[in-house]
């Protein structure tokens, strides 16, 4: 396809200066590393030829550890010290993960991100992920024969700021230079688009082990533009496993709480094997012997499994509908649907996608590898290993709006959701009170109109504002989201030049369904939110006018006779009494009455100020 030429700093001008960079898919179930070799992206195998590395780490006493296949094989005998699906814990707090389905771990009550107690001490998800990333880095350096200059690491499009920051921290801990965090659906589109010369509108349906993303992309002459993104950061293949696990226990008359942790892990592993077998066969047999000596033997059909997981399949279609709506396109406009993630091998998923979009999904690239391959292509570009006609432009988006709290607990959106990144947007605000010398900046994320209904990301203060009349100061607040989707906020008072800033690093991320719930709530409650916003705005304006009028009466009350002053004071009292109420129309009417009732007073104050300014001056001096 014809490709768009762009310039990146540090591009290698000659082949012999080629720098080694890789793409890494840090997955919930499996991870892998890929690189561009001889102009072709390929997944790099380990010394036994296996490409996929199970995302499993087992901690041993005295600092020992097993990573990948060895850890997975020993998970059933030491479940408490063998961490699986750690990606689900990235950027999460203890309260959010303690109820994780059938998790055998001891979670530690520590501030910030969740911690897990092992025989080798307390470990964070960042440390566990770093073990996996370090293993992949070593594999790449052994295969490629040199040190890496950097890596592009993929993350779910619906990962929030905390989860992205945790991923970057894990990479640094693993000794990796992060060239870019790349959204997984976008990486898949790169691999598919460049491989097939595709153009047009495409949907990327990405169902991994622990997350689901749906992105709508427009591919045109080397430009990959993400029109909209939707998803569920706590829905993946693991959830299908747990549903089947629960079904097996019900059929056997067993209670999960009564099972030994090693039996839970063993049974989950065997259930996952049944799920995978049903992708190729109409039925599969579960045959497992528990530590108690009890043997479970069950035959599970593909139809039984499909009926069991139908609610989860429908959960993937809700974000799909939202993404199409946000992109202002219909399912019929989509030229192709790219499947990503091992969970998309399930026939129930492929059938649902085909039915919804009215066309068979595109499956000519390995769904387990396509994300890493796309990341490798992007890494090769960012490392400077490009040649003529080998560039493209990525236009990715943020999944939720970013805003700031204004007077009255309202949210002023600075960057709306589905804005292309990197992006910087600025807006001016002013002071509310006379002589105000500081301003609190409260950064929030979400789609609702009130701060109380959105997620708080960060707070900081701008101090040193010169004392001025209310409304005279000009504070410019700038929001900047980088190519990794990470946010920084800057505030500057325009007259004095005083500045303050914050790099947003929340202690941990959104809850399991918070992002989807935020969007759903914003649609369901739009009318209520707007009424609430109108009321808050009316109350804020009423308070401002009452305070301004009282200050004017204190300063220049002698400009009014007794009758006029009594009228103004009555209007002030009426507005002050109405302001705390919930009748926005009544507050607006009282505000208007006070404003009109003080017009003559304002004119007299203006004349007084003019006379004072002109006193003692001659006409030719003016």
From Swiss-Prot:
Keyword field: ATP-binding, Chaperone, Nucleotide-binding
One record GO biological process: iron-sulfur cluster assembly
UniProt GO molecular function: ATP binding; ATP hydrolysis activity; ATP-dependent protein folding chaperone; unfolded protein binding
SUPFAM superfamilies (UniProt xref): Actin-like ATPase domain, Heat shock protein 70kD (HSP70), C-terminal subdomain, Heat shock protein 70kD (HSP70), peptide-binding domain
Pfam families registered for this protein in UniProt: HSP70
Source organism, top-level taxon: Bacteria
Signal peptide segment: none
Cited InterPro entries: ATPase_NBD (IPR043129), Heat_shock_70_CS (IPR018181), HSP70_C_sf (IPR029048), HSP70_peptide-bd_sf (IPR029047), Hsp_70_fam (IPR013126), ISC_FeS_clus_asmbl_HscA (IPR010236)
Membrane-spanning intervals of the chain: none
Its job: Chaperone involved in the maturation of iron-sulfur cluster-containing proteins. Has a low intrinsic ATPase activity which is markedly stimulated by HscB.
NCBIfam families: HscA, PRK05183.1
Family: Belongs to the heat shock protein 70 family.
Protein's name according to its UniProt entry: Chaperone protein HscA homolog
Organism for this UniProt entry: Burkholderia thailandensis (strain ATCC 700388 / DSM 13276 / CCUG 48851 / CIP 106301 / E264)
